Amino acid sequence: MNIIFLIILFPLIGFLFLSLIQGTISERNTNIIGISSIFVSLIITFFYITGFINYSSQIFTQKLFSWISINELDIDCSLILDGLSLSMLAMILGIGLLIHIFSTWYMKDKEGYSRFFAYTNLFIASMSLLVLADNFLFMYLGWEIVSICSYLLIGFYYKTTNNTSCALKAFVFTRISDVFLIISMFLIYNKYGTFNFQEIKFLSNFLNVEDCFDLNVLTLCLLLGVMGKSAQLPLHTWLSDAMVGPTPVSALIHAATMVTAGVYLIARTHFLFLLTPKILYLISLIGIITIFISSFSALVQQDIKRILAYSTMSQIGYMFLALGVKAWTAAIVHLIVHAIFKALLFLSSGSLILSCNNEKNIFNLSKVSSKCPLLYVSFLVGGASLVSFPLITSGFYSKGNILFSVLKDGYFNLFLIGLFCSFLTSIYTFRMIFVIFHRSSVSFVFSNKRLAHNLPLLILLFFSTMFGYFIIRLPLFYVFPMVKSLENGKFLYEIISSFISFLGIFIAYHIWIKQPFWFFRFLKFKIIKLIHKFLLNGWYFDFFYKILFIHPYLFISKILSYEPFDFFPTFFVAFIKKTNSIVLKSVNGNVKCYISTMFVGINLFFILVLCSFLS
């Protein structure tokens, strides 16, 4: 029985129901529609997972209908379910379901309750379409709807001007990137004569690596096309501003799912990048630079959600680094592990913010560990997984596989930078935890948490530990090329990595808990203040973009806003009016002026006549 299409259909039906009847049903009925639609899709996904337990090489396909048929161009609306799309689906629907359950507590009695669940259901449907589509064109449909959902949810509180500006910024940045994605699709069709992933993969086997200049251009455009959505340098600045939306949105879209769509697309088209090693190296360079920049920016942020946003950029950078060294499986495993612990951190921060009267500054948040131990443990486990705390966290194994793959592939310089940034990650993560939970501050009253609040956190907390990593077994064996695993030296690497994590936590404890006065005294130096301000403003990327792009664009737009053909009649009318005013000044009733004018006129007349005779 082929029912893949139902995975997309149920969330889509949920979106349509909630959109059409919003405001007319209770919050309880909204919950039932919004959650059950995703739950049914997740059950169907588990049905297919059972088919992959013993047959991981199996591929399910389903043709829905013929979309375009013009001469030799035949494009079907078809779905494909292999190990990669199944892994992504389990993550999207599993985490999406938990976030929807949490949102019933978070959004309770808030304006736009049904609208929120309608948007998130549409997002789940479009993200499912993105990973299930078997061709570029059908995938692009889901890709664009995901961007629309992101825009709608960032600007969910649209009555605030700043929120709409941030939503528009995210939309524009991702649109810039999408232009290159469209170009790459045209180049792919020109090269292969098809948009189908499996057909392109088959035809790529007959191409020569040495004779692929057009493939370099193609994969470069494809890389540029995914950088915007995955918030990689230089199209990364929108993500930190996207945190103005509801916190469950940040967990669902801007940490767990949408921002990883670029990683998925590169993994899906890995057979193209294998033919272009230079572009692969460029992917790893972009990843490591993004890791470096975002890690330093996170060190000085005071907004809890912006800290998590910069950490998201950094972790996606690690995924790009893995893709660049052909560690495809390591990238996807870290993608899913990161989605779990980052969703845990975002939901915990959302609970904390809501309980503390929407306070987001970590230095103003209260000492809450004794009042809500679940939040403290959630932050501790999620943060430990983020910093790759040894042995007991899932992040230790997933990120460790990436860095070890970089090392064994011979990129020692990239490995050192990645290891150093892992050290920075442990500092800024535990800076956040120590400041929030271990410093005395103003106390806030916490509301009693319901099952809808606690259950998602407990499930995510469990899967963020080592048990989650060992339970999750992704069916990727037949999706990517088989690579011989070399474990020589891995134990030594794990010791070094563990030491770095402990060192970062130790430094964070001494700077912000044990002896904070030394740190604040250090900040009084002028050069340190300038560096702090530079990093706090995200390396001034937005400032440079305004100077280089926005201001020239506004200047040119202002010039072009005037219709050029309107200039001539306006100028002619102004000339007539000016001439008329000058002539009128001569009619002033002064006889001497009239005689002088006549005298000058007669003399000019005779001079002209004389000149005509002489010529």
From Swiss-Prot:
Reaction(s) catalysed by this chain's protein: a quinone + NADH + 5 H(+)(in) = a quinol + NAD(+) + 4 H(+)(out)
Key words of the record: Cell membrane, Membrane, NAD, Quinone, Translocase, Transmembrane, Transmembrane helix
GO molecular function, one term: quinone binding
GO biological process per UniProt: ATP synthesis coupled electron transport; electron transport coupled proton transport
Enzyme Commission code(s) on record: 7.1.1.-
TM ranges: 1-21, 32-52, 79-99, 113-133, 136-156, 168-188, 247-267, 279-299, 327-347, 372-392, 410-430, 457-477, 491-511, 536-556, 594-614
Localization of this protein: Cell membrane
Domain of life: Bacteria
Keyword Ribonucleoprotein included in the entry's annotation: no
Pfam families assigned to the protein according to its UniProt record, in alphabetical order: Proton_antipo_M, Proton_antipo_N
Gene Ontology, cellular component aspect: plasma membrane
Membrane topology category: Multi-pass membrane protein
Function: NDH-1 shuttles electrons from NADH, via FMN and iron-sulfur (Fe-S) centers, to quinones in the respiratory chain. Couples the redox reaction to proton translocation (for every two electrons transferred, four hydrogen ions are translocated across the cytoplasmic membrane), and thus conserves the redox energy in a proton gradient.
Subunit structure: Composed of 13 different subunits. Subunits NuoA, H, J, K, L, M, N constitute the membrane sector of the complex.
PANTHER family xrefs: NADH-UBIQUINONE OXIDOREDUCTASE CHAIN 5
Family per similarity comment: Belongs to the complex I subunit 5 family.
NCBIfam families assigned: NDH_I_L, PRK06590.1
Official protein name in the record: NADH-quinone oxidoreductase subunit L
